[in-house]
């Protein structure tokens, strides 16, 4: 009987632990002191890229120090809706994309010129709301990275401000610098370095096997409510180049409609935060674990 009671208790605990995360629950609010409008200069030259440290080079460019925040994206939507650059399509925001060249490769899908999904407003994970007139951000997420945004939505944001998504090589150089480190901050990873699966940060809800994003620049050496972060900037001063959210990159490869992401996320294991790890999805894909940052030519 005791064994039966214990089994019931264990089953109840497991069922409770599998309950879905309440995406609308209040979240901790911390001030990081990091300005999301800051850009970093990346010099021209060679660097090591990939798992096997191959040599590549880039021209000089600039890249955002943080991911685009939800507040920044809401500001973009308000401006773009006012001037007709985007439009509502039911519970979705769509915008024009000029299309890709189609090569007819097996499994390649056509991406034609037209209106494509930027963000879904009707998805439960969306942190931006629309009252019929104005886009606003769900309270507490203003300085978190913009998520649940498609590749088209990331591309459209950057294009609107005369910038672009970084290439994979540009992203990796900004994350790694010119040495052979596997992580933006060095050779090893600890829980205080980044937001990843089971990192035990203040935004993680392990009781339901879920987690939330952290504000951009959160891992800067500060202590937040007893949680000690480690200054985890890349050699060029970029934050969150590992963990928190995957980041869309701008490459459009011949014969392939998939787009690539870098950096790992709050939902990936620590080893998937290594600089050379890649992920890919269709350009209409969106997720609470995917965001982006912009780059621009000097």
Language-model features and meaning:
Residues 47-55, 70-75, 83-86, 226, ...:
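Short, solvent-exposed loop/turn elements at domain surfaces
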Residues 25-29:
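Primarily auto-inhibitory N-terminal propeptides
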Residues 30-41:
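GGW-centered surface loops in extracellular recognition modules
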Residues 129-279, 288:
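Functional-site microenvironments in short loops/helix caps that host divalent-cation chemistry
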Residues 288-298:
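Short, structured beta-strand segments at or near domain termini in extracellular proteins/domains
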């Amino acid at each position: 009987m005791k064994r039966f009671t214990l089994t019931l208790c264990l089953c109840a605990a497991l069922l409770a632990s599998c309950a879905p995360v309440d995406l609308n629950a209040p979240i901790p609010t911390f001030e990081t002191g990091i300005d999301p409008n800051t850009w970093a200069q990346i010099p021209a030259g060679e660097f090591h890229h990939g798992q096997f440290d191959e040599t590549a080079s880039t021209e000089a460019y600039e890249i955002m120090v943080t991911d685009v925040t939800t507040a920044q994206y809401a500001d973009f939507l308000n401006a773009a809706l006012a001037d007709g650059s985007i439009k509502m399509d039911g519970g979705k925001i769509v915008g024009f994309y000029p299309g890709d060249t189609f090569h007819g490769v097996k499994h390649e899908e056509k991406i034609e010129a037209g209106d494509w999904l930027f963000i879904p407003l009707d998805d439960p994970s969306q942190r931006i709301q629309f009252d019929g007139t104005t886009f606003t951000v769900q309270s507490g997420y203003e300085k978190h990275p913009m998520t649940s945004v498609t590749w088209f939505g990331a591309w459209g944001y950057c294009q609107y401000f005369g910038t672009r998504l970084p290439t994979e090589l540009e992203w990796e150089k900004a994350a790694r610098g010119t040495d052979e480190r596997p992580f933006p901050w060095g050779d090893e990873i600890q829980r205080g370095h980044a937001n990843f699966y089971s990192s035990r940060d203040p935004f993680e809800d392990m009781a339901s096997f879920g987690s939330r994003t952290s504000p951009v620049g959160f891992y800067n050496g500060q202590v937040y409510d007893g949680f000690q972060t480690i200054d985890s900037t890349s050699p060029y001063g970029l934050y969150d180049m590992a963990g928190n959210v995957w980041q869309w990159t701008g490459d459009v490869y011949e014969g392939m409609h998939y787009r690539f992401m870098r950096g790992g996320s709050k939902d990936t294991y620590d080893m998937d935060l290594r600089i050379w790890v890649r992920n890919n999805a269709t350009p209409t894909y969106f997720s609470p674990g995917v965001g982006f940052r912009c780059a621009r030519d000097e």
